[in-house]
Amino acid sequence: DPLFVIDGVIRDKEAFDLLEPYEIDQMSFLKDAATASIYGSAAGNGVVLVTTKGGTKNQKPIFNYQGSYAFSKPTQELFADRWDAIDDLDYQNAVARFQGTPLPNGEEEYAYFRDNKINYNVNDYIWQNPWNTKHSLSVNGGTDKVKYYVMGSFLAEEGSYVSLANKKFSLRSNLSVDLTKYITMNVNLDANQSNDKRFYWPFSDDDDQAVYDLYRCTFNAMKTTPFYSYLDGTPANTITDYPIYQDYGSWQGWNPVDQVVGNRYLKTRRRNLNGIVSFNINLDFITKGLSTKVMASYLGH
């Protein structure tokens, strides 16, 4: 990764990813000898310089709202939707022929699934079209001595599987005050909180929201096997309080639907607070064009 410098402070990629597009004023990509001379070996992969927005002198408050809503859906048929229960019966018989064992499915089994139109598709229970919505409200302005910019934003999104959700709240406040003719104080505050929720998946790290392996595992869910039953034990075509755990080869007691919609889940809350205080000192009274800057920053997770 390149080196990320946000408002003059070296930050990590996570801090860069948390930036909202609305709060960025300027962004530059540097990779040359001069850059290396300033930032050293850490700039070997280049430097990304980001300056966030600030206020404008002698300007009345200007409010700006931006919002969006987006959703997506697959352009191709999902892999697990490409076969049905009859195809599973054919597959089981084909395996038996290859192994030289009696066929497990005869006309009675075929008639049962065909005539009753039974097809237990895992995607009917756990798949959804993902969506996200973003909203931000900002105000900026200033007087002849004070400039300010304040922005609050909200993001909510849900993934392709139910029980995959994320919410993020962000707040930024950039204040600049001319203390004297020669000294300007800048106070930048950046705070955000993200709330991630996903179903428990034992084969992914707790911080992994992708759960790629689940998509592959849904291929193994047989269309002939119900995922739930009613109290009396009869198969159910909907989610009930009685999940059925079937063996799938080496998988013992596996129910991909209940794994996603059941009461096993992970909730992760992350909070970040970044504060920067700096003083720009004009030393023109010593030598024309001479200036210096003193900066302190605080980062909390």
What name fits each language-model region?
Residues 2, 7-34:
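Short acidic/polar hinge/loop motifs at secondary-structure boundaries
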Residues 2, 46, 54-162, 201-202:
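Residues embedded in well-ordered regular secondary structure
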Residues 17-22, 39-44, 164-166, 201:
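Short, glycine-/polar-rich solvent-exposed loops and beta-turns at beta-strand/coil boundaries
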Residues 27-28, 48-50, 277:
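Non-catalytic regulatory/gating segments with a bias toward low-complexity or hydrophobic composition
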Residues 32, 68-74, 155-159, 192-196, ...:
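Structural signature of outer-membrane beta-barrel domains
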Residues 63-65, 148-150, 185-187, 290-296:
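Transmembrane beta-strands of outer-membrane beta-barrel proteins
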Residues 75-105, 192-247, 301:
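A surface-exposed, glycine/aromatic-enriched loop/edge motif typical of exported proteins
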Residues 128-144, 153-155, 248-301:
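Outer-membrane beta-barrel transmembrane strands
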